[in-house]
Amino acid sequence: MKYIGAHVSAAGGLANAAIRAAEIDATAFALFTKNQRQWRAAPLTTQTIDEFKAACEKYHYTSAQILPHDSYLINLGHPVTEALEKSRDAFIDEMQRCEQLGLSLLNFHPGSHLMQISEEDCLARIAESINIALDKTQGVTAVIENTAGQGSNLGFKFEHLAAIIDGVEDKSRVGVCIDTCHAFAAGYDLRTPAECEKTFADFARIVGFKYLRGMHLNDAKSTFGSRVDRHHSLGEGNIGHDAFRWIMQNDRFDGIPLILETINPDIWAEEIAWLKAQQTEKAVA
């Protein structure tokens, strides 16, 4: 079964994220559990936690259908020790918030070397950051998102994701989220079913589908291989409809949150309905 939704606002209270997801007939959703552009947030209150859990129960969202995202400020591969420690503390806090809310996944961007250390050193720092966070939490899986490779961001190659996973001690609590726009911008073609087959065969060989814990379904304003992260509405960008139809008809993407981060929230309900409709076509093996 496909879990299809969008990254919805939690403005006014975390419970509102579940309500907003239900309003667009989503069967999954993503959210920030705190302001994504600030380092610190007030601790979650018992009332906030209870209201969120009650809303999820009311609208039938389990933890398998919810993909929280961490703060954009966090860089788990930071080359400077003091800044790295600050990011690690913030990431642990994000993991603990998920733990309190009964959520089992936390999606994050891996990190950037800032042109100050090697890719290998940065990837090792990211893996160690994950190890530290996993050691201090329970029940939450760290879900590494592939990137478009803008600037000095790592995670744009499947090999980067594999290297991070290789350095994580508890393999049962690490996974990946593949963003289609990021993959396309990083040079993984998705414009035809044949290209989708090739890209995900590479993913299966290098990373492994057992680690796929979520996806971001975004078309791309950015061009192929441009290393530029610019999302677009489904079918309106340079990827086109075929990739998303292919994903919907492929059972390897069942049982994980498939999340829209497309640019027009006003048509999310339409995009979700379109994605759901594609499942009725002939299934892809």
From Swiss-Prot:
Reactions mediated catalytically: Endonucleolytic cleavage to 5'-phosphooligonucleotide end-products
Transmembrane segments: none
A GO term for molecular function: DNA binding
Keywords, comma-separated and alphabetical: DNA damage, DNA repair, Endonuclease, Hydrolase, Metal-binding, Nuclease, Zinc
UniProt: Zn(2+) 2 binding residues: 145, 179, 216, 261
GO annotation, biological process: base-excision repair
Cofactor: Zn(2+)
Binding, Zn(2+) 1: 69, 109, 145
E.C. no: 3.1.21.2
Organism domain of life: Bacteria
Gene3D superfamilies, A to Z: Divalent-metal-dependent TIM barrel enzymes (3.20.20.150)
A Pfam match: AP_endonuc_2
Positions with a binding annotation for Zn(2+) 3: 182, 229, 231
Cofactor binding comment, as recorded: Binds 3 Zn(2+) ions.
Family according to the record: Belongs to the AP endonuclease 2 family.
Free-text function comment from the UniProt entry: Endonuclease IV plays a role in DNA repair. It cleaves phosphodiester bonds at apurinic or apyrimidinic (AP) sites, generating a 3'-hydroxyl group and a 5'-terminal sugar phosphate.
Name of the protein described by the UniProt record: Probable endonuclease 4
Organism whose genome encodes this protein: Shigella flexneri
